[in-house]
Amino acid sequence: MPSATNSKTPKIFRVTLEVADLDKAAKFYGKLLGTEGKRHPGARHYFDCGGVILAVLDPTAGGMTPTPGPKSLYFAVTDLEAVHGRAKTLNALAPYKVHGEPGGAVTKRPWGERSFYVVDPWGNDLCFVEEGTLYT
């Protein structure tokens, strides 16, 4: 896939995931991502993920019910095993299968990526992919 070099092409700068407990989410994502992030007004906690902000938001603060976000949110990482270890400590490895293999296991996928899947406590699916194996 060619890279977007056109300055008129919109770029993604923030992705929001809804959670029901902002403090718990800040701790969960802080440990999983290996960074504290930063609390912001409006029941939000931001994590800088390589120029794209992951914003965890507690909609219950405004009287709304949280709903899981996109099917999967993908992160490119340089040390896949370290992130996998943190996810395992958090008991967050995905229990489902991906292409016949355990989703929570570090696996080389049919398209060449080495990856594993995580489910956060609010039902959001995340995938972590080893940087040198990204399929784009």
Q: Residue ranges of each PLM-predicted region?
A:
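Active-site beta-strand termini and strand-to-loop segments that position acidic
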Residues: 47-51, 118-121, 131
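Acetyl-CoA-dependent GNAT
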Residues: 57-61, 108-109, 130-135
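Vicinal oxygen chelate
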Residues: 22, 73-125
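Conserved beta-strand in the GNAT
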Residues: 55-57, 117, 126-129
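N-terminal beta-strand motif that seeds the catalytic metal site of vicinal oxygen chelate
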Residues: 1-26, 71-73, 129-136
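Core segments of cupin and vicinal oxygen chelate
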Residues: 9, 16-54, 59-60
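Conserved positions at the start
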Residues: 12, 44, 113-115
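Helix-adjacent hinge/juxtasegments
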Residues: 63-67, 71-77
